[in-house]
Structure formats: structure tokens, C-alpha cells
């Protein structure tokens, strides 16, 4: 898919990886709906992007993605404003082992809800033109993490859901592709949250190994994750792909064993 002229919706767009996604999409000629619960950060983000791009290229909507009604209303506003939806990026996420219900609601449930809402608007079965859905996971979605069991579970859930939903979308001839991104440590506010007891709870005492891993593996810049996003959008052959991004190997993909049964549905 060529990005130029397309309409994208990015959750968690006010800062970090989400903001890098928005800027990368705008540079490619897309119109972008900036969705974030943080009103102050969202307004500042749009103002900064307006200095670089035409103001009509972006729309900021304050939304708590964990609130189903707010999320549904946000999709409606985006389509009413821009006329369509071509690219959906479910990026909003948190790290909170203390309030683990919140972590699951934002990191996993809202991604599933957002994906289904995106399919409602983009699927050819519903009169849409097709499109692409990118869900943000993590390397923690591919391996165990002792200090972040709930965060880890939420990211594993995204990987399993995305791969399965991609097969389903293809089976139904929806015209929508679904992929996920699993980066290593990225320089974002979430990374800083691992140092706070209010986020980590009882696991705060055991963060030494995580900090050692950060020093060993290094920390990615959000712009590198944005490069991965553009790759997943522009390569029409990628559906159900799980992209890994690390400082040592850059952009690469997770390999999975497949059966003839799975091959028929891909």
C-alpha cells in the first residue's frame, strides 16, 4: 500500500513511538488522526506537527482507549472528518504490574476492540476499501519476563490475536492486512516507568536484571520503530507478520512452524 493520500488513525500518538509513527506517516503524505488520553500532550503534539505539515493533515482526539464508547466514537469522528480510514495503528499501551487489570484493558482489550472497529470501517465486506492494521507488541510478547508477567501476557496476547485475526481477515476476503511489531527496549515514557513502585509494585525490588539487559542490548530510538511501521504498510505481501526490531539485528521477522492447514488460510 502506498501511504500517500491515505488516512491513518494512531492511538497513543502524543508521545514516544506513537508520535514517531504519526510523523513518519505525515512525511509519506498521509492524513493522521492523533488519538491519546493525554490532552495536554496531544495538543502540544498537534501544534508541533502543524509547524511542519499543513494543519488540515492532522486531527487530535482525546480518548481513553479502555472506554469502549469513547473508542467507538473516536473511529466515527475520524471517518466523519477525513471521509475514510485506510491505516490503523493500535499503539497505546502502559506498563503497570500493580494495577494489572488496567494493563490488560489498555494493552490487550483495547487492541482487540480497535482492530474490530477498524475492520468494521475498512473491510470490503462492509463496503470499505480494505486497508492495514498494525498492532504494537514487544519482544516481551515473544519471551517470558519475570518482573513483568502481566505486561508480558498482554503482549503475548497481541501476537496471538494479530496472527489469528490476519488469517481470519484473509479467509473472509476483507482486503485488510494485520501485522504486529515487537521491538526491544525503546526510549519512551513507558521505559522510564519500570523505575517506579507505583507501576511495578512488588517487582520493583527485582529490576536489577532488567537494567542490566538494557545496558547490554541498548535502547532503540522511536524513529527506528517508525521505519518498521512503514515497511509493514508498504509491503503488500506481509500479512500476519510479526516484526522484531533490535539494536543488534535491526528489522527482522519472527519465524513460525506452519502446517498445511494454516497455509491454506494465510
From Swiss-Prot:
Predominant location: cytoplasm
GO CC terms of this entry: cytoplasm
Reaction it catalyzes: prostaglandin E2 + NAD(+) = 15-oxoprostaglandin E2 + NADH + H(+); (15S)-hydroxy-(5Z,8Z,11Z,13E)-eicosatetraenoate + NAD(+) = 15-oxo-(5Z,8Z,11Z,13E)-eicosatetraenoate + NADH + H(+); (11R)-hydroxy-(5Z,8Z,12E,14Z)-eicosatetraenoate + NAD(+) = 11-oxo-(5Z,8Z,12E,14Z)-eicosatetraenoate + NADH + H(+); lipoxin A4 + NAD(+) = 15-oxo-(5S,6R)-dihydroxy-(7E,9E,11Z,13E)-eicosatetraenoate + NADH + H(+)
Annotated binding of substrate, by residue: 138, 148
Any one Pfam family match given in the protein's UniProt record, by short name: adh_short
UniProt-annotated catalytic positions: 151 (proton acceptor)
EC number: 1.1.1.141, 1.1.1.-, 1.1.1.232
Subcellular location: Cytoplasm
Key words, A-Z: Cytoplasm, Fatty acid metabolism, Lipid metabolism, NAD, Oxidoreductase, Prostaglandin metabolism, Tumor suppressor
Molecular function GO labels: 15-hydroxyprostaglandin dehydrogenase (NAD+) activity; NAD binding; NAD+ binding; prostaglandin E receptor activity
Major enzyme class: oxidoreductase
InterPro entries: NAD(P)-bd_dom_sf (IPR036291), Sc_DH/Rdtase_CS (IPR020904), SDR_fam (IPR002347)
Electron transport as UniProt keyword: no
Binding of NAD(+), residues: 12-20, 36-37, 63-65, 91, 151-155, 186-188
UniProt key word DNA damage: no
GO biological process: ductus arteriosus closure; female pregnancy; negative regulation of cell cycle; ovulation; parturition; prostaglandin metabolic process; regulation of prostaglandin catabolic process; thrombin-activated receptor signaling pathway
CDD domains: ADH_SDR_c_like
Segments forming a coiled coil: none
Subunit structure: Homodimer.
Function: Catalyzes the NAD-dependent dehydrogenation (oxidation) of a broad array of hydroxylated polyunsaturated fatty acids (mainly eicosanoids and docosanoids, including prostaglandins, lipoxins and resolvins), yielding their corresponding keto (oxo) metabolites. Decreases the levels of the pro-proliferative prostaglandins such as prostaglandin E2 (whose activity is increased in cancer because of an increase in the expression of cyclooxygenase 2) and generates oxo-fatty acid products that can profoundly influence cell function by abrogating pro-inflammatory cytokine expression.
Family: Belongs to the short-chain dehydrogenases/reductases (SDR) family.
Record protein name field: 15-hydroxyprostaglandin dehydrogenase [NAD(+)]
Organism of provenance: Bos taurus (Bovine)
Name of the gene this protein is made from: HPGD
Amino acid at each position: 500500500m502506498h501511504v500517500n493520500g491515505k488516512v491513518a488513525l494512531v492511538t497513543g500518538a502524543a508521545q514516544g513511538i506513537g508520535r514517531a509513527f504519526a510523523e513518519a506517516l505525515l512525511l509519506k503524505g498521509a492524513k493522521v488522526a492523533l488519538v491519546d488520553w493525554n490532552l495536554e500532550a496531544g495538543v502540544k503534539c498537534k501544534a508541533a506537527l502543524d509547524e511542519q505539515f499543513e494543519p488540515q493533515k492532522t486531527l487530535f482526539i482525546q480518548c481513553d482507549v479502555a472506554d469502549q464508547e469513547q473508542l467507538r466514537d473516536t473511529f466515527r469522528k475520524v471517518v466523519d472528518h477525513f471521509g475514510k480510514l485506510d491505516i490503523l495503528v493500535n499503539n497505546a499501551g502502559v506498563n503497570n504490574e500493580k494495577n494489572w487489570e488496567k494493563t490488560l484493558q489498555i494493552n490487550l482489550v483495547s487492541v482487540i476492540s480497535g482492530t474490530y472497529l477498524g475492520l468494521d470501517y475498512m473491510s470490503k465486506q462492509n463496503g470499505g476499501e480494505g486497508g492495514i492494521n498494525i498492532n504494537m507488541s514487544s519482544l516481551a510478547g515473544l519471551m517470558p519476563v519475570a518482573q513483568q508477567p502481566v505486561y508480558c501476557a498482554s503482549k503475548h496476547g497481541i501476537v496471538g490475536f494479530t496472527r489469528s485475526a490476519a488469517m481470519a481477515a484473509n479467509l473472509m476476503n476483507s482486503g485488510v492486512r494485520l501485522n504486529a511489531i515487537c521491538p526491544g527496549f525503546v526510549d519512551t515514557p513507558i521505559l522510564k516507568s519500570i523505575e517506579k513502585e507505583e507501576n511495578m509494585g512488588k517487582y520493583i525490588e527485582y529490576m536489577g536484571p532488567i537494567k542490566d539487559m538494557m545496558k547490554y542490548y541498548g535502547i532503540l530510538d522511536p524513529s527506528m520503530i517508525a521505519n518498521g511501521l512503514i515497511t509493514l504498510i508498504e509491503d503488500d505481501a506481509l500479512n500476519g507478520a510479526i516484526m522484531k526490531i533490535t539494536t543488534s539485528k535491526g528489522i527482522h521477522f519472527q519465524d513460525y512452524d506452519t502446517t498445511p492447514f494454516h497455509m491454506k488460510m494465510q
